[in-house]
């Protein structure tokens, strides 16, 4: 079976596992106050080029979104998201604040879409828009340009909105060949974002970076309140320490993107219809519904939706994948599609 299902289907990158094993017998302080977590935060701050932030490690994307959004918003305040935003479609109602959606453009929200929502919510008989949520990369593997992020940031600042970036796949966004955003840009662009480890070589864990320190007061209370605090916080600390020690975080993501580009080019070569342009490690194709079962017999992948009589299949490249695996997948798809 060729695995193109997702980028979190293995326990962890070998180097992460090696370091976890290395520190097996160490005695650590709990709750994220250990030496590994402290050092991991310093390594992240070095990447950001600033110490003016508050960093917390949480177990996964949904709990990170849940804790942060619940901490900073009042019950009557709402989040603006595109219709395909993860908090809107894949978090089982975890976000209890109302989500105001706008149609996505290639998986992304636009500054104009935000303005339209603001124009429709004008008084206390409606929820009050207070946050803009995006993910980078998006649910469709697309990425935001620096100009797009600057435009969103400008609208947020002009309208007193909190700008929050879901970075579950931030690694692939920052290492995309189409990208012009650096990690050091994020502190000036948004109020908070997180660095995804779960989908970038870690066993689990996300690093939430709160740039707007006015939002971080008593944040550890909220982490505990919502069940997001690790007793063994050093488990995340060791992993992020490893990911940011020698650029492993970027190395993993860059490989995934390169394989994604290769897979897309090979799919085009055999005349498979691409649903959306590939910018990172998620590739979406359109194929006759009757051929899905034959593909899934040999390739682990997900059906993402339908367009008329065609299925949208998502392929995701990962750090343990090799070009030879892609070549085998292409041969199979080509034979099925004849």
Task: Give residue spans per PLM region.
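Conserved N-terminal alpha-helix of the aminotransferase class I/II PLP-enzyme fold
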Residues: 13-60, 83-84, 88
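Conserved C-terminal alpha-helix-loop-beta "cap" of PLP-dependent enzymes
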Residues: 74-76, 261-336
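Conserved core of the PLP fold type I
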Residues: 52-73, 102-107
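Active-site C-terminal subdomain of aminotransferase-like
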Residues: 143, 181-280
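Active-site pre-lysine segment of PLP-dependent enzymes
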Residues: 145-154, 158, 169-192
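Active-site phosphate-binding strand-loop segment of PLP-dependent enzymes
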Residues: 4, 110-167
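PLP-dependent aminotransferase-like
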Residues: 73-130
């Amino acid at each position: 079976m060729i695995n193109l299902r997702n980028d979190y289907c293995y326990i962890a990158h070998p180097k992460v596992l090696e370091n976890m094993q290395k520190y097996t017998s160490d005695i650590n302080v709990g709750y994220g106050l250990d030496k590994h977590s402290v050092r991991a935060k310093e390594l992240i701050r070095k990447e950001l080029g600033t110490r003016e932030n508050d960093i917390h490690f949480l177990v996964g994307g949904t709990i990170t979104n849940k804790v942060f959004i619940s901490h900073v918003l009042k019950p009557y305040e709402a989040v603006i998201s595109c219709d395909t935003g993860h908090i809107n479609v894949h978090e089982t109602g975890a976000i209890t604040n109302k989500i105001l959606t706008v149609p996505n453009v290639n998986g992304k929200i636009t500054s104009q879409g935000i303005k339209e929502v603001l124009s429709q919510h004008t008084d206390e008989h409606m929820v009050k828009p207070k946050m803009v949520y995006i993910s980078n990369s998006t649910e469709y593997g697309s990425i935001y340009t620096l100009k797009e992020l600057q435009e969103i940031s400008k609208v947020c600042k002009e309208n007193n909105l909190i700008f929050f970036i879901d970075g579950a796949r931030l690694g692939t966004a920052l290492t995309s060949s189409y990208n012009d955003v650096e990690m050091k840009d994020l502190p000036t662009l948004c109020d908070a974002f997180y660095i995804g480890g779960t989908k970038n070589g870690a066993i689990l864990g996300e690093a939430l970076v709160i740039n707007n320190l006015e939002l971080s007061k008593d944040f550890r209370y909220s982490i505990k309140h919502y069940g997001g605090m690790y007793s063994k916080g050093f488990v995340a600390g060791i992993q992020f320490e490893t990911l940011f020690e020698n650029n492993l975080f970027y190395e993993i993501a860059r490989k995934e993107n390169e394989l994604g580009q290769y897979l897309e080019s090979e799919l085009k070569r055999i005349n498979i219809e691409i649903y959306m342009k590939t910018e990172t490690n998620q590739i979406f194709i359109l194929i006759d519904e009757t051929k899905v079962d034959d593909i899934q017999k040999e390739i682990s992948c997900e059906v993402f939706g339908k367009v008329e009589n065609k299925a949208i299949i998502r392929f995701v490249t990962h750090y343990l994948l090799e070009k030879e695996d892609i070549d085998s997948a292409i041969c199979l798809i080509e034979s099925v599609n004849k």
